Amino acid sequence: QANANHLTTMLYNASADACAILNNSAGNLSIRQQSGTGVLASSITGSTGDIYQIAFDCDTGKVFLGRNNTYYRVGAADGDPASGTNPSKTITANKEYCIGLSCYGGSGAGGGIINYGQDSTFAGNKTAGGNSDANGVGDFFYAVPTGFLALCTSNLPDITIGPGQSSQADDYFDTILYTAASSNGTH
């Protein structure tokens, strides 16, 4: 949830791949990419209480940036994460990325509350949404797009070797004491 004159919600890594939804001091929204800026539409203005969203398909590299459950791309508000159409940007798939929020500058106080699925009320500032992903994980204000999961460890695949599994690391590694068959230790 945003309360800022300047707000940026972004997905980035150390390479040239980066994208962000930017709410500037005039309240106009734009998508910023590493190589420049594209204006979404002149009639779209952000305001206090807006909810900004990121849906990232790491297999295809498609990033969907949204505000109040509408997903944008440059020149249109027709992004559909569930069908994979009209992403805000397509970036290099299968890399490590960071998600961030930045509030900066301007004449008013800025701030934001980030919900990765822990509290759809945004610390009591909204009525609870009560939406979870397909695995029943999370508490989101808006419904999670079909095919997307909350960003958390409980949505990672189970490991095949580990403390909670029937297969243990020491099943594959063992110490064997060897006693030589001859007096000089050769075998």
Regions found by a protein language model. Name each.
Residues 1-187:
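Polar, enzyme-active/binding microenvironments
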